[in-house]
């Protein structure tokens, strides 16, 4: 397959370069990119690993695990500390100039304990462009992995210790914290006039609390916001399983979406990007029908979590983070996926301020999905997002 140069594919470069030097203004659908905030040291990892450890160590040291494996995947601009406003400024400006309308930051909270919040508080909100750029938060109700790279394949994929329990009081405290710190900001993303918040593991949230408990927690949080004069809430359920998807509307969620909706998690090791992306797009209307709520499509440029797993050689385990791996990913194919998602969002008949597309993600390098420049394709990933929007949306 044709490979793009460091500045992007020749097809993309023939398009007007002036588009990447100014903020694009779109008529309808908003495209929002998830942000993984784990690119700085934290005390918990300093104590568990070597001082200063971050997942950059995994990304930069990963080696091919099978013939043709595209590893390591290296950042063209080098490793960075996402608490540094200067490093964040450059990336936010790149998003602004290439059709990303806002960022959704993972917010790790476990009964008041927070980790990785400095990427948002110091890096993003500390940068001039960040302070004026739309953003929202996703409650990451799983704490970061305690062992990296993962070395045992006999343990649960999701360690029970990582799952974040909650109850009515804790959920209200979480929402109050987010509202007072972020919802009140002028640049905070609103959907239908309400502050946008998503829950990463909505299945665990509903399974743990039950339908009645989840409804009580969400109702109490909304009442707290109203009584405190804080912005009202638009709550999105991410990736609800078949077990709970019929409960999300009754619990009080307003919409459904996904984080990474690309691989078949129980499928073969190697899965083709074009096949998987097309199949997932056909599932979007089914998700909305099952949830009886608006569905906001999510697309990804790729998937390969190999950096998070130890090298088992030929005995590569058939499970996360070793498997599956998406192959054949390319900016041209991602451009098609973006155009398809934008067209779907527009065709759903929602009001313009409720038409959303999500991209996973801006920077989750250790899982192989990112828009930031890499050494294989240069700027072509984020240029593909821009050009996918051009293909599906008229400029104002």
Place the predicted regions along the sequence by residue.
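N-terminal regions that are enriched for targeting/export leaders
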Residues: 24-90
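Substrate-binding cleft of secreted/luminal carbohydrate-active enzymes
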Residues: 325-376
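Aromatic-rich peripheral "rim/lid" segments of glycoside hydrolase catalytic domains that contact
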Residues: 55, 126, 360, 368-396
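Aromatic-lined glycan-binding groove of carbohydrate-active enzymes
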Residues: 28-37, 43-46, 206-332
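Aromatic-lined substrate-binding rim segments of carbohydrate-active enzymes
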Residues: 87-137, 297
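The substrate-binding groove and active-site-proximal loops of carbohydrate-active enzymes
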Residues: 71-85, 101-113, 155-169, 195-211, ...
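Active-site region of glycoside hydrolase catalytic domains
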Residues: 132-136, 141-265
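Conserved, mostly hydrophobic/aromatic
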Residues: 33, 95, 193, 297, ...
């Amino acid at each position: 397959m044709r490979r793009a140069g460091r500045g992007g594919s020749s097809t993309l470069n023939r398009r007007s370069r002036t588009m990447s030097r100014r903020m694009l203004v779109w008529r309808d659908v908003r495209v929002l990119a998830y942000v993984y905030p784990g690119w700085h040291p934290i005390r918990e990892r300093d104590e568990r690993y070597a001082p200063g450890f971050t997942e950059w160590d995994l990304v930069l040291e990963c080696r091919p695990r099978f013939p043709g494996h595209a590893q390591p995947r290296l950042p063209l601009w080098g490793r960075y500390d996402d608490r540094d406003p200067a490093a964040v400024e450059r990336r936010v400006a790149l998003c602004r100039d290439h059709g990303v309308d806002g960022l959704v930051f993972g917010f790790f909270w476990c009964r008041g304990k927070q980790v990785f919040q400095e990427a948002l508080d110091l890096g993003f909100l500390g940068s001039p462009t960040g302070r004026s750029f739309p953003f929202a938060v996703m409650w990451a109700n799983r704490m970061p992995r305690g062992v990296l790279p993962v070395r045992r394949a006999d343990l649960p994929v999701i360690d029970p210790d990582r799952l974040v329990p909650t109850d009515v009081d804790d959920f209200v405290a979480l929402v109050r914290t987010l509202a007072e710190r972020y919802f009140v900001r002028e640049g905070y993303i609103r959907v239908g006039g309400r502050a946008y918040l998503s829950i990463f593991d909505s299945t665990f949230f509903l399974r743990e609390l039950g339908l009645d408990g989840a409804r009580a927690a969400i109702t109490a949080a909304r009442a707290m916001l109203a009584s405190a004069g804080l912005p009202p809430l638009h709550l999105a359920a991410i990736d609800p399983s078949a077990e709970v998807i019929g409960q999300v509307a009754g619990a009080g969620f307003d919409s459904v979406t996904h984080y990474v909706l690309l691989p078949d998690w129980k499928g073969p090791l190697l899965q083709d990007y074009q096949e998987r992306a097309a199949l997932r797009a056909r599932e979007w209307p089914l998700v909305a029908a099952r949830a009886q709520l608006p569905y906001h499509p999510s697309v990804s440029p790729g998937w390969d979590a190999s950096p998070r797993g130890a090298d088992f050689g030929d005995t590569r385990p058939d499970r996360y983070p070793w498997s599956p791996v998406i192959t054949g990913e390319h900016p041209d194919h991602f451009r098609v996926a973006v155009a398809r998602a934008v067209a779907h969002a527009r065709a759903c008949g929602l009001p313009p301020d409720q038409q959303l597309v999500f991209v996973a993600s801006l920077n989750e390098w250790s899982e192989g999905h990112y828009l930031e420049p890499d050494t294989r394709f240069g700027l072509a990933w984020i240029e593909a997002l821009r050009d996918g929007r051009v293909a599906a949306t008229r400029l104002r």
